[in-house]
């Protein structure tokens, strides 16, 4: 109901006919993906940085920390949701203070460090709850930085479509990292899951830094507006 009292912003891609509007949406998306900046962000969305994939596997390793079913449900359910909201708010604030892609990578590295710390921590139920909540808290930071990067990149034309395009692509690393984390667990146990999650995240940041440096070199020699 609240939306009824808000004025709808102008849609720059919209024309008098549907086909014209769709054509403009296609051009907007194409222009996003064919610029160096847009392609770099598209690539970033494909990387396993700060995706929080281990959250889907906590129940598989809870026994290693002697955590009860109730503790797992509480920590990985309501409490994780609450702390991730707080993380999103703080992470969004920080993302406005520094370069947003830098914030995204930085938060991803912090998440990897927390994952390693969990692997090294004592195997008790209390430690399980603490680190599950810490993981959710930092993942909130990562999701806020993700949103900041997307909103910074999409511009005004066909913003909803471009936002959903990048958001959809960002689900790819969540899927494949969950599979890779599961393989780490099957091969090396709980620590294998945690170290795999952390190592892949760090590798993703390193890969993005390398590609970003190359992109900046290309941008410095490209015509204005690219």
Predicted region positions:
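Intracellular juxtamembrane helix-capping segments at the cytosolic ends
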Residues: 141-155
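Hydrophobic core of transmembrane alpha-helices in multi-pass small-molecule transporters
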Residues: 126-142
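A late C-terminal transmembrane helix in Major Facilitator Superfamily
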Residues: 157-187
């Amino acid at each position: 109901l609240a939306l009824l009292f808000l004025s709808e912003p102008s849609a720059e891609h919209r024309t008098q006919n549907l086909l014209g509007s769709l054509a403009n949406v296609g051009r907007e998306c194409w222009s996003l993906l064919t610029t160096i900046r847009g392609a770099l962000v598209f690539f970033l969305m494909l990387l396993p940085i700060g995706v929080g994939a281990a959250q889907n596997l906590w129940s598989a390793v809870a026994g290693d920390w002697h955590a009860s079913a109730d503790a797992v449900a509480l920590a990985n359910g309501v409490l994780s949701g609450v702390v991730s909201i707080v993380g999103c708010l703080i992470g969004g604030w920080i993302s406005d203070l520094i370069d947003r892609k830098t914030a995204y990578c930085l938060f991803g590295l912090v998440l990897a460090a927390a994952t390693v710390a969990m692997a090294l921590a004592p195997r008790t139920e209390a430690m399980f709850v603490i680190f599950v909540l810490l993981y959710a808290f930092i993942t909130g930071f990562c999701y806020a930085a993700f949103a900041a990067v997307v909103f910074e990149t999409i511009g005004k034309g066909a913003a909803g479509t471009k936002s959903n395009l990048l958001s959809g692509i960002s689900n790819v690393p969540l899927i494949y990292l969950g599979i890779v984390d599961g393989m780490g667990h099957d091969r090396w146990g709980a620590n294998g899951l945690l170290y795999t999650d952390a190592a892949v995240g760090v590798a993703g940041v390193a890969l993005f830094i390398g590609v970003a440096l190359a992109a900046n070199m290309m941008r410095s020699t490209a015509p204005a507006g690219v």
